[in-house]
From Swiss-Prot:
Keywords: ATP-binding, Cell inner membrane, Cell membrane, Membrane, Nucleotide-binding, Repeat, Sugar transport, Translocase, Transport
Species of provenance: Treponema denticola (strain ATCC 35405 / DSM 14222 / CIP 103919 / JCM 8153 / KCTC 15104)
MF-aspect GO terms: ATP binding; ATP hydrolysis activity
GO cellular component: plasma membrane
Bilayer disposition of the protein: Peripheral membrane protein
Alphabetical list of CDD domains matching this protein: ABC_Carb_Monos_I, ABC_Carb_Monos_II
Domain ABC transporter residue range list: 6-241, 252-497
Name of the protein in its database record: Galactose/methyl galactoside import ATP-binding protein MglA
Keyword Endoplasmic reticulum among record annotations: no
Binding positions (ATP): G38, E39, N40, G41, A42, G43, K44, S45
Catalytic activity, as annotated: D-galactose(out) + ATP + H2O = D-galactose(in) + ADP + phosphate + H(+); methyl beta-D-galactoside(out) + ATP + H2O = methyl beta-D-galactoside(in) + ADP + phosphate + H(+)
Biological role: Part of the ABC transporter complex MglABC involved in galactose/methyl galactoside import. Responsible for energy coupling to the transport system.
EC numbers on record: 7.5.2.11
Family from the record: Belongs to the ABC transporter superfamily. Galactose/methyl galactoside importer (TC 3.A.1.2.3) family.
Lineage, broadest ranks: Bacteria, Pseudomonadati, Spirochaetota, Spirochaetia, Spirochaetales
Gene responsible for this protein: mglA
Length: 497
């Protein structure tokens, strides 16, 4: 009997004249983890949509356990043992864990939903997977990591032979990542196979047996992880060699510019006694564990969270923002962590998203000028090197990296003095990351004061001048980037736990 679970042969897919998949071949073996990498727009999502029946393939064949398949929709795929855990989890947050597990297939007894059987089945399932989850818990009260466990357990309950994990660690702490990996390894021993889609190379090398790399719709590399290295994978992804993971941080910070003194926020989660200074043209990293208060601090600086006491000043001029509109008027910009929820209008165009925060600048005699709007959009497309068809294209059609470029371009149109960036490269491929790093350093050289939140320690060490570390919503310390290391950052992040 063959140990091949999934085999994709010569898979091709076009949209009009644009060929997004070109003769893809991929083999996933039983009990193995196949890493799938590639720049945003390389074809990973299209490939998965062809597998799950969302798109109809133009050419090629897909087989599951040596049986030819062509799913009509994801539900049919799930019932056949092929499941996907999305980056943005697909759950009913106001229902219990048990309800989510059995949604659409409730066990009944004489036509009545058998809640006792559901609870017992759910408890047994979590026990078999060594997951500490209470089936009666409402999903909304659970952490992202716990919700993810529920999604994986749901896949297992369908007797899944293959589980696709899409950027599974993007919102997880280091401890939660280790828990996820232990679950993956336990399921591997039971014969379950995985496709692990990620931009995080260190994770691919840790948890995957094989790795495949897509570029421009073609399979560039597919081999055992043990037989490759980081440089080969990067070269396969971007089509060129990246000698360094990070550009040179060669900006020269100037005099003190932004000063925070004894800052305390009013509503939970409360930040307490936050004091620090950022210089003009400086890149200050903000590091801490999930829940440390990093995002909340940026929100307080941007007028989203109410400040109970303390002060914010620029060039010794005290400021008090009652809204984000006031913060923007004083030269602040905020790149949010959840770009799809808070950073863009997903149903609108690149052009609309570029100009929406600065409409008064595109008026002629009080009337919006289509010419000025188009010029602004095209200017930012060129500046950010955004890969798109035109400014009229819907932003939702772009890859994650290109969406982020549009959002950054939107703020650059306002020429901010202080740029607050919350996880600016989250869910973005290595090539696009490098471009955003270059942009951050370029902005600092132009005199902008930048605060960057990142959960990736190599990133926070690779693109900053200094690093402020948060612990339990308090400032644990500030260190010079060139004089610190990962151990110091971890020790500071646990200071007030």
């Amino acid at each position: 009997m063959s140990d091949v679970v999934l085999e994709i042969k010569n898979l091709s897919k076009s949209f009009g004249k644009n060929k997004v998949l070109d003769g893809i071949n991929l083999t996933v073996r039983q009990g193995s983890v196949m890493g799938l990498m590639g720049e945003n727009g390389a074809g990973k999502s299209t490939m998965m949509k062809c597998l799950f029946g969302i798109y109809t393939r133009d050419e090629g064949a897909i087989s599951l356990l040596n049986k030819s398949i062509e799913f009509k929709n994801p539900k049919e795929a799930l019932e056949s043992g092929v499941a996907m855990v999305h980056q943005e989890l697909n759950l009913c947050l106001d229902r219990t864990v048990t309800d989510n597990l059995f949604l659409g297939r409730y066990p009944t007894n004489f036509g009545i939903v058998d809640e006792i059987k559901m609870f017992e089945s759910a408890s047994s399932l979590f026990s078999s997977l060594n997951m500490n989850v209470n089936p009666k818990t409402i999903m909304r009260t659970m952490s992202v990591s716990q919700r993810q466990m529920v999604e994986i357990a749901k896949a297992v309950s369908y007797n899944a032979k293959l589980i696709v994990l899409d950027e599974p660690t993007s919102s997880l702490t280091e401890r939660e990542v280790k828990k996820l990996f232990s679950i993956i390894r336990a399921l591997q021993k039971k014969g379950v196979s995985f496709i692990y889609i990620s931009h995080k190379m260190d994770e691919v090398f840790e948890v995957c047996d094989e790795v495949a790399v897509l570029r421009d719709g073609k399979m560039i590399l597919s081999k055992p992880v043990a037989g490759t290295n980081m440089n080969e994978i990067i070269s396969a992804m971007v089509g060129r060699s990246l000698d360094k993971r990070f550009p040179d941080v060669d900006n020269v910070p100037g005099e003190d510019f932004l000063k925070i003194e004894n800052l305390k926020t009013k509503y939970a989660p409360v930040l307490e006694d936050i004091s620090f200074t950022v210089r003009k043209g400086e890149i200050l990293g903000l590091y801490g564990l999930v829940g440390a208060g990093r995002s909340e601090l940026l929100e307080a600086l941007f007028g989203i969270r109410t400040i109970e006491s303390g002060s914010i000043s620029i060039n010794d001029k005290y400021l008090k923002f009652k809204s984000s509109k006031e913060a923007m008027a004083h030269g602040f910009a905020l790149l949010t962590e959840e770009r799809k929820l808070n950073g863009m209008f997903g149903k609108d165009t690149i052009e609309f998203n570029t100009v929406i925060t600065n409409l008064n600048n595109y008026k002629t005699i009080g009337v919006l000028s289509k010419r000025k709007i188009r010029e602004a959009a095209n200017r930012e497309i060129e500046t950010m090197r955004t890969r798109c068809l035109s400014a009229d294209q819907g932003i939702s059609a772009l890859s994650g990296g290109n969406q982020q470029k549009v959002i950054i371009g939107k703020w650059l149109e306002r020429s901010p003095d202080v740029f607050l960036m919350d996880e600016p490269t989250r869910g973005i491929d290595v090539g696009a990351k490098y471009e955003i790093y270059q942009l951050i350093i370029k902005m600092a050289k132009e005199g902008k004061t930048i605060i960057v939140v990142s959960s990736e320690m190599p990133e926070i060490l690779g693109i900053t001048n200094r690093i402020a570390v948060m612990s339990n919503r308090r400032l644990a310390g500030i260190v010079n980037t060139k004089e610190t290391d990962q151990e110091t950052l971890l020790r500071l992040s646990a200071k007030y736990l």
